[in-house]
Each structure stands twice: as C-alpha cells, then as structure tokens.
Curated annotation (Swiss-Prot):
This is Heat-inducible transcription repressor HrcA. The keyword Acyltransferase does not apply. Gene3D superfamilies: 3.30.450.40, Heat-inducible transcription repressor hrca homolog, domain 3, Winged helix-like DNA-binding domain superfamily/Winged helix DNA-binding domain. InterPro entries: GAF-like_dom_sf, HrcA, HrcA_C, WH-like_DNA-bd_sf, WH_DNA-bd_sf, WHTH_transcript_rep_HrcA_IDD. The keyword DNA-binding does not apply. NCBIfam families: hrcA (TIGR00331). Belongs to the HrcA family. One of its GO terms (biological process) is negative regulation of DNA-templated transcription. Keywords: Repressor, Stress response, Transcription, Transcription regulation. It holds the Pfam family HrcA. Disulfide bonds: none annotated.
Length: 339
C-alpha cells in the first residue's frame, strides 16, 4: 500500500521528469516542490518507491526516473487533465470536416493529421479492410453512350467510383431503376457474400440489362477486394525524433522498423472502444517496451469501425495528450454519428 506522502513525491518526480527529461534527485524535489519535508526524508521515500517498483535508477545517474509501473499509477490515480486553450479547442472543431459532405476515410486521415500536429506524436489509424465492408448503395450515372460511372458507397462511408463500359447506355430513367434494383439486391452484403445465386437473381431481375450487371459486378469486386486484414496507416512518423529517447541511432532504427511493420503495429493497438493507455511493460511487442500507446475507437453510426492511436516514449505529457485525445475523439464521433 502506498501512502499519501509517497504519492505526492512520486507525482512530483514524474511531473519533473516529463518536463525536463533529466533524472530527478531528492534535492530537486525539495527545492522545486513545497512538500513540507526535508531532502533526506524525500531521499528515503524515493528509495522505498524504487524498492516498490515505481522508480528506476539509470546506470549513469544518481537521480531516479519513473518506471512503467510508476507511470501507470500516475495515469490511474494522480493525473489531472490539462485544460485546452481556446485556440486548441477552436482548431479541433474547425479541422474535423463535415461528415455529411466527405468520405469517412478522408475525415479519419484529417483527424490523424490533427492529432499528430497537436500532440507532436506519431498517430496510427487501424481501420477494417474495405474487403469487409457492406454495400450501402450503388448509383449508375451516364458518362457517354458507352460509359457509365458506377458510384459505390459502403456502410462505413467509403466511396469508390469506377467507369464501366457497356454496349449502349440506357436513358437516365432506366439507369435510376437499374441502380435501385442493384442496390436492393446487394445492400448489406460483403464481397464474399455476392455468390452465384445472388448474381443469378440479379440477372433475372434485370433481364435485358445483363451486360450492365456483368460490368458492374467486376467493378464492385475491384473496388472492395484487398488485404483481408485491418488497414493501418501512419501520420507524423518524423515526430518520433522530437524525443531525446530516440537520439540513439539503434533505438531510432528499431522504432522506425516497428512503425513500418503493419502486422506488429496492428497487434499493438487495443480494439476497445474506450480510451486505453498502455505503458512500457504492458505492451507485448518487444520493440515497444519503452513506449506508451494511447488509443480510442471511432464509430460510424452505431457500428464500431476502427481505432486511432498515438505512440511515443513513456515520457510524454499525459495530462495534455489525454485531454487532446478525449476532445478530438468526441468531436470525431459526433461528426461520424449520422454517416
């Protein structure tokens, strides 16, 4: 059991280390923080905190730094969210574009760029493969006498446009009718569910327009095919170099290789809808043992769709980063609510 004085000292050490990046000694805490105890008492408490696993001593320093366990206690029991400035709040509101006017993937990419800019961390987006998306609607529009623009909209808001060639393009009224029938027959199906029976039924429903059906379906397949695993993309990879923890060329190379390994990155990120913070030893990928990862889910309508995460060293300003992440995800999910 950790008492209140130890908690106060641990909080002071973590806040000082986050601010300076330098190991913290008892004299520093005694001078900078009004804790009402002597340097000797603080030194003894720090020794106890180290024995309890909340502090570590770097080999080359007499000072102490927080361990993963220390950061975890700080995040769980001591953190106070930093109030965002009016400029930051305004930037968040203005940067997440109107969800009724743009594709979901564009909104997510813009949001990841915003998070990377505000936190100075690397942002990771884990989204389900388009391969797993459901058809929401298909609209056919005349381009010329032998060309039709096929506009596919999926349930997660992704829009794909493909031009198909046919013998002769029907009049607009017929195209509207064909679009409606195709949408009715394919709605809420994934590419894997569009089997021979579905195709046969569609051809019967659109007798006389088989050439259009036979052109639309391959176009649909091309739009939705792809890797069956989650899609992962990064924003702000260069932000890693903002931290002295990665001044060491070996560590920098290791983290960059990790960031470009999509399978490993996908395993790093929690699929929980809730805000999740993983620190150091809680991360089961060896190359990320000295990192922190903050992640949260995003939704389209009522459907949980993907995860946005921030990755950096253990020494980050949790108060500020969690405030930014909370506000951005709130704004994002509100924007996507009616998609």
């Amino acid at each position: 059991m950790i008492d209140d004085r130890k908690l106060q000292i641990l909080r002071a050490i973590i806040q000082d280390y986050i601010s300076t990046g330098e190991p913290v000694g008892s004299r520093t805490i005694a001078k900078k923080y009004n804790l009402g105890v002597s340097s000797a008492t603080i030194r003894n408490e720090m020794a106890d905190l180290e024995d309890m696993g909340f502090l570590e001593q770097p080999h080359t320093s007499a000072g102490r730094i927080p361990s993963s366990r220390g950061y975890r206690l700080y995040v769980d029991r001591m953190i106070e969210f930093e109030r965002l400035s009016s400029e930051e709040e305004g930037l968040i509101r203005s940067s997440i574009i109107d969800g009724t006017l743009y594709e979901v993937d564009k909104i997510i990419k813009q949001t990841s760029a915003l998070l990377s800019e505000l936190t100075k961390m690397t942002c990771i987006v884990k989204a389900p493969s388009v391969h797993k998306s459901f058809v929401k609607s298909i609209q056919l529009l005349k381009v010329d006498d032998v060309s039709i623009l096929c506009v596919l909209v999926t349930d997660n808001g992704v829009i794909r446009n493909t031009v198909i060639k046919v013998k002769s393009v029907p009049i607009s009224e017929e195209l509207i009718k064909i679009s409606k029938i195709i949408t009715e027959r394919l709605k809420n199906l994934t590419i894997e569910q569009i089997n021979l029976e579905v195709i046969s039924n569609l051809n019967r429903a659109l007798s006389g327009y088989e050439d259009i059906v036979n052109a639309v379906l391959p176009a649909l397949y091309e739009s939705l095919k792809g890797d069956e695993t989650s899609e992962v993309f990064l924003e702000g990879t260069i932000n890693i170099f903002n931290y002295p923890e990665y001044n060491n060329i070996h560590k920098a190379k290791e983290i960059l290789e990790l960031l470009h390994d999509k399978k490993s990155i996908s395993e790093l990120i929690s699929d929980s809808d809730d805000m999740t913070v993983k620190i150091g030893d809680e991360i089961f990928v060896p190359e990320a043992k000295e990192c922190s990862i903050i992640s949260a889910g995003y939704h389209v309508g009522d459907r949980s769709l993907g995860t946005i995460a921030l990755i950096g060293p253990r020494r980050i300003n949790y108060s500020k980063v969690l405030s930014i992440m909370t506000e951005v995800m709130k704004e994002l999910n509100e924007t996507l609510k009616n998609k």
